[in-house]
Amino acid sequence: METDLFGNPDSPDTTKNAAAEAAKATRKAAPKDQASPLAERLRPKTIDEVVGQKHLLGPGKALRSAFENAHPHSMILWGPPGVGKTTLARLMADAFGLPFISISAVLGGVKDIRDAVEKATANRERTGRSTVVFGVVCHSVFYFHDVVFLPHGVSGLFTFIGATTENPSFEVISALLSRSTVYVLESLKDEDLKELLERALEREYPSLKVNEEAEKILIGLADGDARRFLNALEVSATMAKDRGIKVIDDKFVRAAL
């Protein structure tokens, strides 16, 4: 059975489809945790819900094709904070029903990586399939090379997805860079954040309205970062609800933030 260096072993389409559908059903059935941040509650469940990144996710574009053609592969997602790197990694795992493990190169260490190897190995023995390993801030993971990539990557144990805010040509180790496809993510445009605002109001704050001036302030503060935008909206919306305010205006946003 053939695999690429970090990709999945070949398996019947029926198995892939069944696993993917099971993963989607599990996510849909899970209750929404109202204590979690707004950005987490609004995290997209399909690539069609992803805001922005049309150059990668539009019809016929490279990353969308990877989803549609059932071809998870090792990749590096390069872009500023809050543009969907973690979301896309999770969606890749969900789309194919693969387990997902996130490792931070800043907070994690070799022990965390070895634990991930053990979990991925157990999954491989149980299902015959690989695990998506997401390396946060992968420009710092110099020790990943010896601990993970050499002994375990060759076996197809992992489909590795790395996220970086730095230029991978200069910051990512060559062993990783040469075996991964680099996708460049862009800061969200104003219209993307407006779409996100409409979604948040519809799903989470149906009794609230945000006037045009307040909207401009929120978008300006976000600077293309969806997480920052939603955090600011959540603070404003929570204060408005507590005070019985139905329309958030520019004065209220300035006072809240």
Whereabouts are the PLM-identified features?
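Walker A/P-loop
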Residues: 2-8, 12-31, 65-103, 118-121, ...
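Dynamic helix-loop-helix/coil hinge segments at AAA+ ATPase domain boundaries and subdomain interfaces
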Residues: 32-58, 102-103
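Short glycine-rich substrate-engagement loop in P-loop NTPases that contacts/grips substrate
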Residues: 56-61, 99-131
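Loop/turn-to-beta-strand initiation segments
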Residues: 73, 128-132, 155-161, 173, ...
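Structural recognition of the conserved hydrophobic beta-strand(s) that form the central parallel beta-sheet
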Residues: 103, 134-135, 159-165, 184
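Conserved AAA+ ATPase "SRH/arginine-finger" region at the nucleotide-binding site
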Residues: 104-106, 181-194
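C-terminal helical "lid" of AAA+/P-loop NTPase domains
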Residues: 216-221, 227-242, 252
